[in-house]
């Protein structure tokens, strides 16, 4: 059984990622960052698998650690003095915590974008924006397809060159550099030819011409209507919370945030449910499928 959120209408997919990525970048409250990172990790594991998640974390965790270490080295604001660096600049608790928050934000956004690239295929982008902004939608769809295609083609070219005795891992430094440049030249040529072929193909099909019709496999059903209303509610409620400073948190010059009240807790609860929407939809669909299967066996 595939991912139910992937099978939703493209408008629902795009609206969810637009809201959750925007909130992940703008809401730097520690609770919001934790919810966003947890939701991104969980959905990445269900969508791409645990092995792919581990591969992402291998470079996301060092990136988060680097952000946490670099910020205190260059930013010395804050009132909680911990120590003095060898340069004589103060090391403050606020600068360390802000670095950790920035690292969590970068990690969550990176994981959400990885999910976006898997769910929002090129066909969905062209379906949503093909008539309104055909040039931009084509560029976005080509960009989303480019990275995985480039990786597959690079592995194929590198393997072919290795069989021809042009390995980039063996030989002298000069020979390895020459072989690597050869592979790079082949990949650049392939990328340009692929872009030209795609542009010629779309032009020959009348893409972007006024009055052009297109076949669509997407249907906006009751489930999509319910999810769309839910996402609009979450977006409006979180926007109201941000404007009312219910989700605010300041790291400088001292740690200050919204007071823990019932309305503040409701903002956090809505944000948590928003981040867990794809996973919750998958869990509900799996539970319904197992119930139907169990009922069929009973009958």
Features from the language model and the residues they span:
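Membrane-interface helix-boundary motifs at transmembrane edges
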Residues: 46-55
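Membrane-helix interface segments
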Residues: 30, 49-50, 133-136
């Amino acid at each position: 059984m595939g991912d139910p959120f992937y099978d939703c209408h493209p408008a629902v997919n795009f609206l969810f990622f637009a809201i959750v990525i925007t909130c992940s970048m703008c809401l730097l409250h520690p609770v919001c960052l934790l919810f966003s990172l947890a939701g991104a990790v969980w959905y990445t594991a269900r969508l791409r698998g645990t092995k792919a998640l581990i591969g992402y974390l291998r470079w996301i965790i060092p990136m988060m650690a680097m952000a946490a270490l670099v910020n205190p080295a260059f930013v010395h604001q804050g009132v909680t003095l911990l120590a003095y660096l060898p340069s004589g600049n103060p090391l403050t608790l606020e600068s360390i915590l802000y670095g950790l928050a920035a690292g969590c934000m970068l990690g969550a956004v990176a994981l959400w974008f990885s999910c976006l690239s898997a769910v929002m295929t090129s066909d969905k982008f062209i379906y949503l924006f093909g008539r309104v902004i055909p040039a931009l939608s084509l560029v976005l769809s080509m960009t989303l397809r480019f990275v995985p295609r480039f990786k597959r083609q690079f592995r194929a070219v590198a393997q072919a060159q290795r069989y021809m005795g042009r390995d980039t891992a063996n030989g002298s430094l000069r020979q390895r550099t020459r072989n690597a440049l050869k592979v790079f030249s082949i990949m650049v040529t392939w990328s340009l030819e692929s872009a030209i072929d795609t542009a010629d193909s779309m032009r020959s099909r009348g893409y972007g011409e006024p009055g052009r019709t297109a076949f669509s496999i997407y249907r906006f059903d009751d489930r999509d209507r319910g999810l769309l209303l839910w996402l609009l509610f979450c977006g409006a409620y979180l926007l109201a919370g941000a404007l009312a400073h219910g989700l605010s948190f300041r790291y400088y010059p001292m740690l200050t945030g919204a007071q823990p009240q019932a309305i503040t807790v409701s903002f956090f609860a809505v944000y948590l449910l928003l981040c867990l929407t794809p996973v919750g939809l998958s869990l509900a669909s799996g539970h319904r499928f197992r119930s139907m299967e169990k009922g069929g066996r009973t009958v």
